[in-house]
Amino acid sequence: SDDKSAGAKYEEWAKDGFITITEGNDIDLSVVADFFLDIYTKYKIKLIRIGYDQRYARAFIDRMEEYGWTREAEDLVMILQNAATLDNAIRLVEADLKARLVNYNQNPVDKWCLGNAGIEIDNKRKCLCVKVEERKRIDGAVTLIILYEMYRRYRTELEKAVKKVRNV
């Protein structure tokens, strides 16, 4: 397959517990929602807000809403995939990667996705994460950028929640 020739090792990554393989040729994002519920149920980790890419998100949103997380309550926050929205987050990710502050535990999927990602700068000097080669995947890199954007937007709220848990 194209992914295999691009360096993807899906079967190995699944065997090692890094990914879950779903049926068909597209990603079943309801499985991602199930993962969040599993984290909450098993480890009692409360999800404060969840950022998501609007592309193909319908199944994810529907399942998350079944579990009680909604867009109306601002539990689910759409992060537009454009340079105006992601510029600050991309610059922060880049700086933290260069400073070796990002610990991805040598996750081979993250390493592969980060290696496939480049930065495109528009005429307004805004950054966007792009594939260095069309056939390669950058989903893990984009997820990290969305995480940084969510942290940037909701840092104060997150820090208050962490402080509250630590004081209990």
Task: Outline where the language-model segments fall.
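Short, glycine/acidic-rich beta->alpha junctions
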Residues: 31, 55-56, 135
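Nucleic-acid-processing active sites and adjacent nucleic-acid-binding tracks
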Residues: 1-46
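Metal-dependent DNA phosphodiester-chemistry modules and their immediately adjacent helices/loops
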Residues: 63, 67-158
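Phosphate-handling catalytic cores of nucleic-acid transaction enzymes
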Residues: 156-168
